[in-house]
C-alpha cells in the first residue's frame, strides 16, 4: 500500500465541508495532517498550544503555515506545563539528549500526559463547533517511545471522547459519534514527507527540532532532527530544514 493510500484509508472525502479540529504544532507531522484534512474536504480549525515548550518558535511557524494552507480559524491556547516539569521540553534543567535512547524506552522528551491534555482541548473545541472529527499527527513507526502515539491510545481516547461528552452520549448511531483520526500513525517519516509533498506542503516552514532557536532554526542533533534528516534522505526529497550555524 502506498503512503498516500495508507493515509487516506478509512477516511472518506467530505463533500459537506464538516468542521474538524486539527491539533497543530507547526511541525512536519501535524502540518502534513492539516493539509490532508483540508484535501479530504473538511473545514479545518487548527489548534496550537503553547505549553511552555523550549522550542516555542514552532508556534510562530504554526501561525504562518495556518495562513499558508488556509484554515477557517487558528487558535493558540496558552497552558503553562512548566509548572509541573518532568520533561526536557518543559524543564530547562533536563538536557535534551543528542544520542538515541534504548529501544522502547520512554525518553526524557516525553511530556507527562501531554497528548491527553491537548486532545482534550481539541475535543472541547470540536464539540463547541458542532464537529465530530479531531485529527492529530501521532506516529508509531519511527517510534520514539511515546505512549500517547500508539494505535491503542488513539482508540482508547476515542472511546473516552464518546463517554465524556454530550454529543457522544446523545449519539444515535456510529455516524454521530466522535472520531479521532491519526492518519499517519502507520507511515514512516519518509512516507509522511512523500505524502506531504504530494499535497504541496512547504516543509521549509515547519519546525520539528526540540531545541530550535527563536528563528526556528534546528540544532541538527536531537532525536527529532535525526528522524527528520533520515526521512528526507529516504524519501529522496531535498531537506529544506534551516539549521543553526555552529
UniProtKB/Swiss-Prot annotation:
Domain of life of the native organism: Bacteria
Binding positions for ATP per the UniProt entry: 24-34
Pathway: Purine metabolism; 7-cyano-7-deazaguanine biosynthesis
The protein's enzyme class: ligase
Signal peptide region: none
Required cofactor names: Zn(2+)
Keywords, comma-separated and alphabetical: ATP-binding, Ligase, Metal-binding, Nucleotide-binding, Queuosine biosynthesis, Zinc
Cofactor note: Binds 1 zinc ion per subunit.
Catalysed conversion reaction: 7-carboxy-7-deazaguanine + NH4(+) + ATP = 7-cyano-7-deazaguanine + ADP + phosphate + H2O + H(+)
Alphabetized GO MF terms: ATP binding; ligase activity, forming carbon-nitrogen bonds; zinc ion binding
Gene3D superfamilies assigned: HUPs
Residues the entry annotates as binding Zn(2+): 209, 219, 222, 225
Any one GO biological process: queuosine biosynthetic process
Enzyme Commission numbers on file: 6.3.4.20
Function (record text): Catalyzes the ATP-dependent conversion of 7-carboxy-7-deazaguanine (CDG) to 7-cyano-7-deazaguanine (preQ(0)).
Similarity remark: Belongs to the QueC family.
Protein name (Swiss-Prot/TrEMBL): 7-cyano-7-deazaguanine synthase
Native organism: Polynucleobacter asymbioticus (strain DSM 18221 / CIP 109841 / QLW-P1DMWA-1) (Polynucleobacter necessarius subsp. asymbioticus)
